[in-house]
């Protein structure tokens, strides 16, 4: 580990020279990447210096215990050694964690897609509930959200809804929400009081900037049509709805919420760009993971990740076996306990992988 950290210290010196270069600012993408690396390496070296300082203090304390004849001073040195060893253990764990390079995607804004699955109207109603849950959470975090596409049912549910959330560390917080969310409750439309089980699929995509993914216009088929409302009726007399098909991948995006065709096209392109970016990132992630399957962050959208049981006021996350009896608060956007637990579990998995890597180096 020390050899790797010493090499990274040399790299920091190189990066500092790059930062001092006045021409760096001319290349915005390179500037951002360099500043991100500088920030990461500076933080890493600060912890490494702390680690080396504690290591030296431990050596000094051991030497003092060995050579000191005064019993009282010897006991004081032993006590100090005990606290230093605990601090050393923590610093070593922090270093291992820091040695896992930060995922640049974590700082990104997101596009979230929620689709009603099995359960018909009840699934669509729960999709609307999840949308409200996430937007309440966004408001608590002072994030902004914008609906990009919506397909509403006559009962006020959503067959599907696509929206963006922008703010600080959005993808890092919500990336583990991708998957199947199962709900168990008595539907409002159910007269007999029987509990029904429905499912909703959530996809969380890091929002791609225009410079990050190139889309050739000849790869797109753009159709315009009249916007439809609940039950299929036309709600617009002009051809403002836009459907974009990306021919190479077969991805289709429809936006019809704006009265302007130009605005709908711009929104559809945002969604398409992020879906294509997500496809690329998923391939890279699969290559990196290869033999290591992450329980927390697999992002498999067909995986059942959470159950919301309304009669018992219970929410269970199946990936980390966490159950909370505060579903009412969760549905109002109190997601921190769930999200923090998922992030900690993912970090622990990464630390185990880092330990394995260091052991077999």
UniProtKB/Swiss-Prot annotation:
GO cellular component: cytoplasm
Pfam families the UniProt entry points to: PCRF (PF03462), RF-1 (PF00472)
Annotated region described as Disordered, given as residue ranges: 282-310
Modified residues (N5-methylglutamine): 233
Source domain of life: Bacteria
InterPro entries assigned to the protein according to its UniProt record, in alphabetical order: PCRF, Pep_chain_release_fac_I, Pep_chain_release_fac_I_sf, Prokaryotic/Mito_RF, RF-1
Listed GO MF terms: translation release factor activity, codon specific
Compartments where found: Cytoplasm
Keyword terms, alphabetized: Cytoplasm, Methylation, Protein biosynthesis
Post-translation changes: Methylated by PrmC. Methylation increases the termination efficiency of RF1.
Entry keyword Membrane: no
Summary of the function given for this chain in its UniProt record: Peptide chain release factor 1 directs the termination of translation in response to the peptide chain termination codons UAG and UAA.
Family membership: Belongs to the prokaryotic/mitochondrial release factor family.
Classification via NCBIfam families: prfA (TIGR00019), PRK00591.1 (NF001859)
Protein name: Peptide chain release factor 1
UniProt source species: Treponema denticola (strain ATCC 35405 / DSM 14222 / CIP 103919 / JCM 8153 / KCTC 15104)
Lineage: Bacteria, Pseudomonadati, Spirochaetota, Spirochaetia, Spirochaetales
């Amino acid at each position: 580990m020390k050899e790797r950290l010493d090499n990274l210290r040399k790299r920091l010196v190189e990066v500092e020279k790059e930062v001092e270069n006045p021409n760096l600012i001319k290349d915005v993408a390179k500037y951002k990447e360099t500043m991100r690396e500088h920030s990461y390496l500076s933080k890493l070296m600060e912890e490494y210096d702390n680690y080396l300082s504690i290591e030296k203090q431990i050596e000094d304390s051991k030497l003092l215990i060995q050579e000191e004849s005064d019993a009282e001073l010897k006991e004081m040195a032993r006590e100090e050694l005990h606290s230093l060893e605990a601090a050393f253990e923590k610093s070593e764990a922090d270093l291992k964690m820091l040695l896992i390079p930060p995922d640049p995607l974590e700082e990104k804004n997101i596009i979230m897609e929620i689709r009603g699955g099995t359960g018909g109207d009840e699934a669509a109603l729960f999709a609307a509930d999840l949308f409200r849950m996430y937007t309440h959470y966004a408001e608590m975090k002072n994030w902004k959200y914008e609906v990009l596409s919506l397909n509403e049912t006559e009962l006020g549910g959503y067959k599907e809804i696509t929206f963006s959330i922008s703010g600080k560390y959005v993808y890092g917080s919500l990336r583990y929400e991708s998957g199947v969310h199962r709900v168990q409750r008595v539907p409002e439309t159910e007269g007999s009081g029987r509990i029904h089980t429905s499912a909703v699929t959530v996809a969380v995509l890091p929002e791609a900037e225009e410079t990050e993914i190139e889309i050739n216009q000849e790869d797109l088929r753009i159709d315009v049509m009249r916007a439809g409302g609940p039950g299929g009726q036309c709600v617009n007399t002009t051809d403002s709805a836009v459907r974009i098909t990306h021919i190479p991948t077969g991805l289709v995006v429809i936006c019809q919420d704006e009265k302007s065709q130009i605005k709908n096209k711009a929104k559809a392109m945002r969604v398409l760009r992020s879906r294509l970016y997500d496809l690329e990132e998923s391939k890279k992630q699969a290559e990196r993971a290869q033999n290591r399957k992450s329980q927390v962050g697999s992002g498999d959208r067909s995986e059942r990740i959470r159950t919301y049981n309304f009669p018992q006021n219970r929410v269970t996350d199946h990936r980390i076996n966490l159950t909370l009896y505060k579903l009412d608060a969760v549905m109002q956007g109190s997601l921190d306990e769930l999200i923090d637990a998922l992030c900690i579990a993912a970090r622990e998995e990464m630390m185990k992988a880092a330990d394995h890597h260091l052991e077999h180096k």
